[in-house]
Amino acid sequence: MRYIRLCIISLLATLPLAVHASPQPLEQIKLSESQLSGRVGMIEMDLASGRTLTAWRADERFPMMSTFKVVLCGAVLARVDAGDEQLERKIHYRQQDLVDYSPVSEKHLADGMTVGELCAAAITMSDNSAANLLLATVGGPAGLTAFLRQIGDNVTRLDRWETELNEALPGDARDTTTPASMAATLRKLLNSQRLSARSQRQLLQWMVDDRVAGPLIRSVLPAGWFIADKTGASKRGARGIVALLGPNNKAERIVVIYLRDTPASMAERNQQIAGIGAALIEHWQR
């Protein structure tokens, strides 16, 4: 009897710790909002089941910024699957087609780039001109929004081209999504029959090869963990990341984090997103 009582006491002693540990990522988000003097939206979703594991302002609108480029290339791959596009098709363009921040496309004015190369540039280097050239192939912002509606996303909307879509005005619904809608759309593109298995692998690989996300979740990723991501940024107080994460080099969860309406510097925004990512990973490992 004494042994049983001791076991019960030991079990009860662990309960407050478990309850305290559970909201830890949300406590970090609240702290980030306080330090940023802005809003944070976040969702952590199980890739296989679609179950929401953690959420904060998940149904509020946030500017997509360059995170839309993953959805854009998903729409391009859907056209490839349908036989309406080819990743090997070459697109030629002129100097006047280039916009600010085009580190890859500006080097290929003479020879052009294939559709596949443009997707790689748009996702791995966040090349804005590459995104605009691809956007034209799917019918512009209205065409991409129509694609979203077709796959069941009735929230996410693209209204403008690069670079105007990064304006992120307070209260402006243009070029926005919600963390919940973006996560659900990513899951449809990467874990359903919306895209062929080959196209899913290609989209994921472009995200794995992201070369401009170093200061965010990648900076706190434990050894041996998988990450595939795409970031977004605005000069007007916004920042974002969409990512797939998991231990043992496997994609297990979707994480979407958006910031908006903060006066914080870009370095501070990066640091806060990294902190939220670290809290999620720490909680995951318990």
Swiss-Prot record:
SUPFAM superfamilies: beta-lactamase/transpeptidase-like. One of its GO terms (biological process) is response to antibiotic. It catalyses: a beta-lactam + H2O = a substituted beta-amino acid. Substrate binds at residues 230-232. GO terms for molecular function: beta-lactamase activity. The active site is at 66 (acyl-ester intermediate), 164 (proton acceptor). It holds the Pfam family Beta-lactamase2. Coiled coil: none annotated. Residues 1-21 form the signal peptide. Keywords: Antibiotic resistance, Disulfide bond, Hydrolase, Plasmid, Signal. Its EC number is 3.5.2.6. The class A beta-lactamase family has a specific amino-acid numbering system, sometimes called Ambler or ABL numbering and often misspelt as Amber. A multiple sequence alignment was used to derive a consensus sequence and then the consensus was numbered taking into account insertions and deletions. This allows use of identical numbers, e.g. for active site residues, despite differences in protein length. UniProt always uses natural numbering of residues, hence there appear to be differences in numbering between this entry and some papers. Belongs to the class-A beta-lactamase family. This is Beta-lactamase SHV-46. It comes from Klebsiella oxytoca. The gene is bla.
